[in-house]
């Protein structure tokens, strides 16, 4: 029986982040990915708005048995690669929250979780990859970064690159199974993913919060070499807390359990405060300085330390000039984010 485009859009609107429309269209891998990442971190769900007509067309064409199996190597997809890296890191963080107490965590659990996240993205749609090679890449990379809080980043990058090299079209189209069996299978995987996470978050809250805060700190420090990406990550991390603040009238978590998790958002806010303090020190201003004062001080320092005005000490001038530029951009970005 053919699928309705209107019904697909209805499910996209009602249960998009949970992948209901992908279940409706028989795309179980895609649905599972959306369930575990809340719609591909929200961005994938929004992107699917333009992709739904194509998915419906492909399903109905397959129903009419008028579909041919593609051969050869699929073209490289930057979007799929980015999704693999992000999902691999996400799976690694979830594993760290729920299973870091295991003695074999860094050597077995972490690379396994990251590789499975990478492979899940690889199996979306009519393509797939070689799970064996993806696992090998993850397990070979893991010992190099043993015990480091950001180890899931290089593991995910290596596994994603390996997965991309072994991408291929499926040899045959998946057979349509009963909905109950498909939901049962998806449910088991979902419980296996969320079970350890829920256990750790509820029964070992303080330790979990401490680990997450440490991992976030290491990640933000590593990303600080890319100011734009670092700022975007900080905003995304603070977004849930700010949304809560709007609906709760102040953002105060009254329950003890939620107060523990509030520490993570306080940690990110503190990280931003430290960056603002360092930027103020470079420009010779303070937290209470107005935008006009900051702009005036910036122009003065740029004029003093511009390399064209300091040919006799060019290297020192270039170093100070770049430092002033970075401090000014940081202050502008943080001040703008506070006004939003």
Curated annotation (Swiss-Prot):
Coiled coil: none annotated. Its main location: membrane. It is found in: Membrane. One of its GO terms (cellular component) is membrane. The keyword Transmembrane helix applies. SUPFAM superfamilies: Chaperone J-domain. Keywords: Chaperone, Membrane, Transmembrane, Transmembrane helix. It holds the Pfam family DnaJ. Residues 1-50 form the TM2 domain. This is DnaJ homolog subfamily C member 22. It comes from Xenopus tropicalis.
């Amino acid at each position: 029986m053919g699928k309705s485009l209107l019904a697909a859009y209805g499910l996209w609107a009602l249960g998009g982040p949970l992948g209901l429309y992908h279940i409706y269209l028989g795309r179980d891998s895609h649905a599972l990915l959306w369930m575990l990442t809340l719609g591909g971190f929200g961005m994938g769900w929004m992107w699917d708005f333009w992709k739904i007509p194509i998915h419906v067309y492909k399903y109905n064409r397959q129903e009419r048995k008028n579909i041919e199996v593609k051969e050869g190597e699929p073209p490289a997809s930057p979007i799929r690669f980015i999704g693999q890296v992000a999902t691999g890191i996400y799976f690694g963080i979830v594993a760290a929250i729920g299973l870091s107490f295991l003695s074999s965590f860094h050597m077995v659990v972490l690379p396994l979780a990251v590789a499975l996240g990478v492979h899940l993205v690889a199996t979306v749609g009519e393509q797939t990859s070689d799970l064996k090679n993806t696992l090998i890449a993850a397990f070979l990379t893991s010992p190099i970064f043993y015990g480091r809080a950001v180890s899931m980043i290089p593991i995910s990058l290596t596994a994603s690159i390996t997965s991309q090299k072994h991408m291929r079209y499926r040899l045959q189209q998946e057979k349509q199974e009963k909905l109950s069996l498909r939901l049962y299978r998806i449910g088991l995987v979902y419980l296996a993913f969320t079970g350890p996470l829920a256990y750790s978050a509820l029964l070992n809250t303080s330790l979990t919060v401490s680990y997450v805060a440490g991992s976030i700190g290491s990640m933000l420090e590593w990303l600080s070499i890319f100011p734009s990406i670092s700022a975007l990550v900080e905003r995304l991390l603070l977004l849930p807390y700010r949304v809560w603040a709007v609906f709760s009238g102040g953002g105060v978590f009254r329950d003890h359990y939620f107060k523990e998790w509030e520490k993570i958002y306080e940690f990110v806010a503190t990280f931003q405060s430290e960056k603002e303090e360092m930027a103020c020190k470079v420009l010779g201003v303070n937290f209470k300085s107005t935008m006009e004062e900051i702009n005036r001080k910036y122009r003065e320092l740029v004029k003093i330390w511009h390399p064209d005005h300091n040919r006799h000490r060019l290297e020192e001038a270039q170093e100070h000039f770049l430092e002033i530029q970075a401090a000014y951009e940081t202050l502008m970005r943080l001040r703008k984010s506070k006004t939003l």
